[in-house]
């Protein structure tokens, strides 16, 4: 894949004005690019850092074409835009990320089948189209297993854990609303992720392996470098995925490590990812920098340098009062507040990163500060 480099001063369009779009825009602007963002929310975070804002729904064909006509290249911050709509845009405008990854990843079953065909190790799974397929799931996977909707769902939404026969009713309810995928429940020892950017002429740049902790299905914190030696194995798995999916830009592969120390691919995020936010302060290039370099046709750095180990923690609505009281006492906290208008207890409102020589102690300090609010 090779395409013309954008000159400085060119215009980048971003579909989606959330925090990822905002941080993309900030990276683009420091490189000399202009930014136009499209989002349905009049007060989305990216609006206030973009040069121009188009308020429209993501399926508004007229508005999407308006974005395309204004911009030299288009990127997107999430995978919830219609793959068919994106395909039509790709036929008319320069969208290096393409539509294939979105088309693939919007369907959990197709995603898992593709990952399996690519030779990566995935958790055993089966398709569940109707309630009678649950018997097959019990026979094939055994208890416990997880039922997930094929389409939609994020941060743990659209899934139920089936521990035993008593939980089956919840699974039946989910299947009544959507086709599903059942997958074996793993005894997870660690969750890790690997962020990678694919650029012009198939250039590949890896970030350090990231160790993640989730709470209530939402990312709570990320530690870099991961405290487990799985980098080489994770890179091997990601390279197999890269050969199977057409994509330009930054993306992240999430992994499970089970109690037997086996590494499994969980899912792919075809854009910059929450677990890579630490890179803004902790690396010589952030995941947003490399994404912008990739979609504008610029060369990527040969490698990413981790300047210092780091702990990144998400800040939810319920954390903000504590944060305001403590922030002045902690100059080591690199704070990012996204500027979202609606404050909810479980909504991601920002994140902070701490650079440290002792991630274990910093982790303990964060627990001591924020444990009571989580």
From Swiss-Prot:
Pathway: Purine metabolism; IMP biosynthesis via de novo pathway; 5-amino-1-(5-phospho-D-ribosyl)imidazole-4-carboxylate from 5-amino-1-(5-phospho-D-ribosyl)imidazole (N5-CAIR route): step 1/2. ATP binds at residues 108, 148, 153-159, 183-186, 191, 214, 266-267. Keywords: ATP-binding, Ligase, Nucleotide-binding, Purine biosynthesis. InterPro entries: ATP-grasp, ATP-grasp_carboxylate-amine, ATP_grasp_subdomain_1, PreATP-grasp_dom_sf, PurK, PurK_C, PurT/PurK_preATP-grasp, Rudment_hybrid_motif. The keyword Ligase applies. It is an enzyme of class 6 (ligase). Transmembrane segments: none annotated. It catalyses: 5-amino-1-(5-phospho-beta-D-ribosyl)imidazole + hydrogencarbonate + ATP = 5-carboxyamino-1-(5-phospho-D-ribosyl)imidazole + ADP + phosphate + 2 H(+). Its EC number is 6.3.4.18. GO terms for cellular component: cytosol. Catalyzes the ATP-dependent conversion of 5-aminoimidazole ribonucleotide (AIR) and HCO(3)(-) to N5-carboxyaminoimidazole ribonucleotide (N5-CAIR). HAMAP family: PurK. This is N5-carboxyaminoimidazole ribonucleotide synthase.
């Amino acid at each position: 894949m090779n395409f013309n480099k954008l000159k400085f001063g060119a215009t980048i369009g971003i579909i989606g004005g959330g925090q990822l779009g905002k941080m993309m825009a900030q990276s683009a602007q420091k490189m000399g690019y202009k930014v136009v963002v499209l989002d349905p929310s009049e007060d989305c975070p990216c609006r206030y850092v973009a040069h121009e804002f188009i308020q429209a729904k993501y399926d508004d064909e007229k508005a999407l074409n308006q974005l395309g006509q204004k911009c030299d290249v288009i990127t997107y911050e999430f995978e919830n835009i219609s793959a068919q709509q994106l395909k039509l845009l790709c036929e008319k405008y320069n969208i290096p990320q393409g539509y294939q990854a979105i088309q693939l990843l919007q369907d959990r079953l197709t995603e898992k089948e593709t990952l399996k065909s690519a030779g990566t190790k995935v958790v055993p799974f089966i398709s569940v189209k109707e309630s009678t397929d649950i018997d097959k799931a019990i026979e094939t996977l055994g208890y416990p297993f997880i039922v997930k909707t094929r389409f939609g769902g994020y941060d743990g939404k659209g899934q139920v854990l089936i521990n035993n026969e008593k939980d089956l009713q919840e699974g039946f309810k989910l299947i009544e609303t959507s086709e599903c995928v059942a997958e074996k429940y793993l005894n997870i020892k660690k969750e890790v992720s690997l962020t990678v950017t694919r650029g012009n002429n198939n250039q590949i740049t890896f970030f350090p392996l990231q160790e993640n902790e989730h709470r209530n299905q939402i990312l709570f914190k990320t530690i870099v470098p991961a405290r487990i030696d799985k980098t080489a194995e994770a890179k091997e798995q990601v390279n197999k995925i890269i050969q199977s999916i057409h994509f330009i830009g930054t993306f992240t592969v999430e992994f499970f490590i089970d109690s037997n120390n086996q590494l499994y691919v969980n899912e792919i995020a075809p854009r910059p990812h929450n677990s890579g936010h630490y890179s803004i302060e902790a690396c010589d290039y952030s995941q947003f920098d490399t994404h912008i370099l990739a979609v504008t046709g610029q060369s990527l750095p040969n490698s990413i340098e981790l300047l210092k180990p780091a702990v990144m923690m998400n800040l939810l609505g319920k954390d903000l009062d504590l944060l305001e009281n403590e922030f002045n006492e902690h100059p080591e906290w690199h704070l990012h507040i996204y500027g979202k208008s609606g404050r909810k207890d479980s909504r991601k409102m920002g994140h902070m990163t701490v650079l440290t020589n002792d991630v274990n102690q910093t982790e303990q300090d964060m627990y001591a500060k924020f444990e009571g609010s989580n």
